[in-house]
From Swiss-Prot:
InterPro entries: Glyco_hydro_22 (IPR001916), Glyco_hydro_22_CS (IPR019799), Glyco_hydro_22_lys (IPR000974), Lysozyme-like_dom_sf (IPR023346). PROSITE patterns: GLYCOSYL_HYDROL_F22_1, GLYCOSYL_HYDROL_F22_2. The keyword Kinase does not apply. It comes from the Eukaryota. This is Lysozyme C-1/C-2. The active site is at 35, 53. GO terms for biological process: defense response to Gram-negative bacterium; defense response to Gram-positive bacterium; digestion; killing of cells of another organism. It holds the Pfam family Lys. It catalyses: Hydrolysis of (1->4)-beta-linkages between N-acetylmuramic acid and N-acetyl-D-glucosamine residues in a peptidoglycan and between N-acetyl-D-glucosamine residues in chitodextrins.
Amino acid sequence: KVFERCELARTLKELGLDGYKGVSLANWLCLTKWESSYNTKATNYNPGSESTDYGIFQINSKWWCDDGKTPNAVDGCHVACSELMENNIDKAVTCAKQIVREQGITAWVAWKSHCRGHDVSSYVEGCTL
């Protein structure tokens, strides 16, 4: 599923991400825009670690989810990577919360590259929240 921007903003707010660990809703929108273009089915393979990033938050199979093929995987969120690509993003959000609790928002490279230090208010502009 490819979310429309304001639809995703509303969904993330309902699931408790607005202000979670001090991260604003606009920052989560910026992160997901640059990680996956709001697409729950996004995947990206990382040849170096032989791991794959999954779903709207691009959660990595080396550390956070189990895809059954990543060497020495940790599965920190105790979730199948396939579950992070469901149209229902509850499990993906639960895992993203764990990542931000343990490592902070800087765990996401796209956030550091595209969102940190930028005015991200436009990501929620015009949305009825």
